[in-house]
Amino acid sequence: MNLFTDFEARIKTALEQIDLVREKRSELDFGRITVEPPRDASHGDVATNAAMVLAKPLGSNPRALADVIIAKLKEDADVADVSVAGPGFINIRLSVGYWQRLLASMINSGTDYGRSTLGAGRKVNVEYVSANPTGPMHVGHCRGAVVGDALANLLAFAGYGVEKEYYINDAGSQIDVLARSVFLRYREALGERIGEIPSGLYPGDYLVPVGQSLAADYGVRLHNMPEEQWMPIVKDRTISAMMVMIREDLAALNVHHDIFFSERTLHANGAAAIRTAINDLTFKGYVYKGTLPPPKGQLPEDWEDREQTLFRSTEVGDDMDRPLIKSDGSYTYFAADVAYFKNKFDRGFDEMIYVLGADHGGYVKRLEAVARGVSNGKAKLTVLLCQLVKLYRNGEPVKMSKRSGDFVTLRDVVEEVGRDSVRFMMLYRKNSEPLDFDFAKVTEQSKDNPVFYVQYAHARCMSVFRQAREAFPGLEVSAEDLAKAVAGIGDPAELQLVAKLAEFPRVVEAAAQSQEPHRIAFYLYDLASSFHAHWNKGKDQTELRFVNDKNRESSIARLGLVYAVASVLKSGLAITGTAAPDEMR
């Protein structure tokens, strides 16, 4: 049960019972009505602006209209008190019985509490990471990997049909450079002294095993071939090896994609997919031949002072038209972007989300233009940009790069502080804001370390059940038993904790609609704070302790509350991709 959706429906029902509202119903926009927690919890449990947004079209005073609405709401047995505040806000306080039934609903739902049908099964493609397959993942890839993965988890929890995708950039000139770098390592494996790696090639030692595997499989045969013959062989082997490495790096971060889409497939069969995409835009009148004026600032790679085949992207929201085919007849990188979007659209996705680094800010408008042009405005495209992560150790900056060819890898960070610390902290700030990651702070066992604080709350919940089994030997209670015992919950401090749990479905839907998975991390910290605060109250107020070995009935009732807290923590942590431990040592 979603408390706020429930009371939104009740408020609208109350409005429909007012004669003046019924008379002017066609002129009223109920969509402007909000139902949310009041800013000050002392004002009540639910607040609505219904009187304020409807007063003007009804020709009424907001406070006067609020009084009429209040009279209707007072007829609801689940409303303990209702009042008007300020210019016309209506504050509602709920009955203890309502909170108890809501808690029972939470217990019965378990980890499905908060799950939503908001998405109604709409297909969403979330593409994230998509790092060039030229080496191991570095720390700069961490944030986009976590944000994209958590967003995909969040959307799935909110009822969307989600596919997680990785676009392999395996068709560009950097892959030729990578293959030449590996070929050098292959020659080294054959016994040749290669000396210092030439400038422009990839110097990393991670390429040595690839060269060795080629030497083991081909001997000197590749060495005797011209480049045009050995290049495709070395490319295939290298890309395969790099993707194995990248998948292992991502798995260490608990990131698993459903689809790995190769850019090379767009160029296969004479670039048939790209030609088809351009033909489609041509049919719609978006393609022409022309010469672009030089843009201000640094010239993009695909600009040239010659006639090219262009996408009329300014007609669909872009700042400038974009080259599709160069004057020499070759396709631009952007042309592959068009074909890739068309591929996603043809696969039936209603919405595509691209999670990119902040350095890709210039791509946003052109990608949005592609979406409008290819889908005729039917598909939605969103680009989320992730700002930089700065590494610190005890407040001192950590160099991102070490010596040439060596750098701080994603695996380095995960192995030092743990997967859960990396994932949760990468979400503990909005993706559009820079993030400071301090190795020392994320391993502290204190309130100042959010991941520890939240996981510790779940572990504490599990410890309560162990205490209960010690206090009452042979105790076995099911979720159904706990749900039936909620009548024992009624202390204001306990109801405050239930109220915090009741926010979860609303947070899930709001986070999914705004595509902001960090909201889940923030909520979990708030819930953990509420739970720890209630735990601490029990130290001084024995009547608030979760387990009272002299009162089995009240203990079981409170176990239900603990079960609900643990379930929401576990669900929220699962969305973030973080474990919910039963114990912490």
From Swiss-Prot:
Motif ('HIGH' region): 131-141
Entry keywords, A to Z: Aminoacyl-tRNA synthetase, ATP-binding, Cytoplasm, Ligase, Nucleotide-binding, Protein biosynthesis
UniProt keyword annotation of Transcription regulation present: no
Family annotation (SUPFAM superfamilies): Anticodon-binding domain of a subclass of class I aminoacyl-tRNA synthetases, Arginyl-tRNA synthetase (ArgRS), N-terminal 'additional' domain, Nucleotidylyl transferase
GO-annotated cellular components: cytoplasm
SMART domains the record matches: Arg_tRNA_synt_N, DALR_1
Keyword Membrane on entry: no
CDD domains hit by this protein: ArgRS_core
Organism domain of life: Bacteria
Catalytic activity annotation: tRNA(Arg) + L-arginine + ATP = L-arginyl-tRNA(Arg) + AMP + diphosphate
E.C. number: 6.1.1.19
S-S bridge residues: none
One Pfam match: tRNA-synt_1d
Subcellular location: Cytoplasm
An individual GO BP term: arginyl-tRNA aminoacylation
GO MF assignments: arginine-tRNA ligase activity; ATP binding
HAMAP family on file: Arg_tRNA_synth (MF_00123)
Quaternary assembly: Monomer.
Stated family: Belongs to the class-I aminoacyl-tRNA synthetase family.
Name listed for the protein in its UniProt record: Arginine--tRNA ligase
Organism: Rhizobium etli (strain CIAT 652)
